[in-house]
Amino acid sequence: MRIPSISKLVFYWIPAAAMLVGYPFIGYDIIAGGFEIHGDQLISMQFLEGTYLYIIHHLLSFIPVFFFGIVLNWFDYRNAVWKELLVPLVMMALIFIAWDILFTALGVWRFNPAYIQGVSIINLPWEEVCWFFIIPFCSLFVYQIVKIRWSNPWGSARTLQFVLLVVLFGMYLLNMDRIYSATSLSMTISMIGLSLIVNWKGFGLFIASFLLLLIPMGLFNGMLTGLLTKEALVQYNSAEFGGIRILSFPIEDIGFGFGFLIGILLLSDFIKHRLSADYTLTK
């Protein structure tokens, strides 16, 4: 990983990312109402109907990771998680919690009181706040397993990075009138751009692990968006996303998760190289 000078980040990447993320908000009014209460229900699971849905979701997500990663010791979680990823995870979680708070306040999405306990932290259900720590931890477990068993497929994948940037920027231009679509795309574009700037060698590995993550993401995100219940726990304002769903969740959620996870890994590498004695500043 090439570590750019602080001035490059300050004068190039940060303004570009801020403009991408912030421009759709200029003079834009969120359209009130229009929440999609029902998801595309695949099957009804009665035991999920109730205020413990989010808690069940977290337990089902965490227990397999705890068993395979910690009990069976599939990877060195003490170094991989506690030493390398814990601080970046917390930092990115705080950024995305702020995003969640803002969009909840603006009416981009809301939470169905029939499926939560009713205790809030900064106007978010406490279960939602926990999501930002539990789900990334579980997702990074998949990344670590792929890292150990698949030895960095596709390398830095620069061609793929450029192709994704072009395609996603085109989609961004077409969806600037939808706040969730625009911010999800702009966050993804910004993170891919940053991975190019720092010449991050782990992009191919991340893409491989993220593609695998889409499988459990369909199930666990579906639990929150009406795939297995009569109504959705997380209800989206239909005017603020593109209307395309994978199973029951908006496709924009993929960009949300992509930006969150790659941000953790980029920040982890940045901190690791900054603290090491052998990094090279690029002027």
For every predicted segment, state its role:
Residues 2-283:
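Aromatic-rich, lipid-facing transmembrane alpha helices and their immediate juxtamembrane interface loops
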